[in-house]
């Protein structure tokens, strides 16, 4: 009986020691213990460290922006022009007798450029001042136009909405110092380009008069030469 009592006491003591160890040891000590890896199994690759945003270069920023564009719904107006859906064409508003009406509809919402020539052989500074006044007038009329000087007498007017290009063209050609406007390959003479055309017509008329005067003189000389031959 005494031996069995001592055995029970020893078992109870051992159980108490195990419980104390479980309570005192941290849980990580048990988490690290796991089944041994088999020789055929490969260890998973270490997780790639995330790059600090302060160390991003241009390529990283471009990839990040592209990812944001994929994840977020971007408004149609913020999309690049080549990604925007083309505006539907209302064929009821197209006049078959006016080709410009078709171009207005097809260029609506698209960027468009036109070339403007200033008359009077101006300097680049004068062209800058004159075209700046034209741009200001268009801005006051709620037209979004950007201007770039490309020569001593030439400038580019760029529109974000090409549907208004022909209205702006009509305004420009009515200005006193506008020689011409080139839009979609078509040259439209301006109010300031009339003097050149008048000079050209005067020169052409003068040439025609000279040709007319030379013809009777040549015929008279031919007649004189013929009469001399007859006398001989």
Swiss-Prot record:
Residues 194-204, 211-232 have a biased composition (Basic and acidic residues). The keyword Zinc does not apply. It comes from the Eukaryota. Its main location: endoplasmic reticulum. Gene3D superfamilies: 3.30.70.260, 6.10.250.640. Residues 163-202 are annotated as: Escort domain. Residues 32-41 have a biased composition (Low complexity). It is found in: Endoplasmic reticulum. Belongs to the MESD family. This is LRP chaperone MESD. It comes from Bos taurus. The lineage of its organism: Eukaryota, Metazoa, Chordata, Craniata, Vertebrata.
């Amino acid at each position: 009986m005494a031996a069995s009592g001592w055995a029970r006491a020893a078992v109870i003591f051992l159980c108490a020691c195990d419980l104390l160890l479980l309570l005192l040891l941290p849980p990580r000590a048990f988490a690290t213990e796991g089944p041994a890896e088999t020789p055929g199994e490969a260890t998973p690759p270490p997780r790639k460290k995330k790059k600090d945003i302060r160390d991003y270069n241009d390529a990283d920023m471009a990839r990040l922006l592209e990812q944001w564009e994929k994840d977020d719904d971007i408004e149609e107006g913020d999309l690049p022009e080549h990604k925007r859906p083309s505006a539907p064409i209302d064929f009821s508003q197209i006049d078959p007798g006016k080709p410009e009406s078709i171009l207005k509809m097809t260029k609506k919402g698209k960027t468009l450029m036109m070339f403007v020539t200033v008359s009077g052989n101006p300097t680049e500074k004068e062209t800058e001042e004159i075209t700046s006044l034209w741009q200001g007038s268009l801005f006051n009329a709620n037209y979004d136009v950007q201007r770039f000087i490309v020569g001593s007498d030439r400038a580019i007017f760029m529109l974000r909405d090409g549907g208004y290009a022909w209205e702006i063209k009509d305004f420009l050609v009515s200005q006193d110092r506008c020689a011409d406007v080139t839009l979609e390959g078509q040259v439209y003479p301006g109010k300031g380009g009339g003097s050149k055309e008048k000079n050209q017509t005067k020169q052409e008329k003068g040439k025609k008069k000279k040709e007319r005067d030379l013809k009777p003189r040549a015929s008279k000389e031919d007649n004189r030469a013929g009469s001399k031959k007859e006398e001989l």
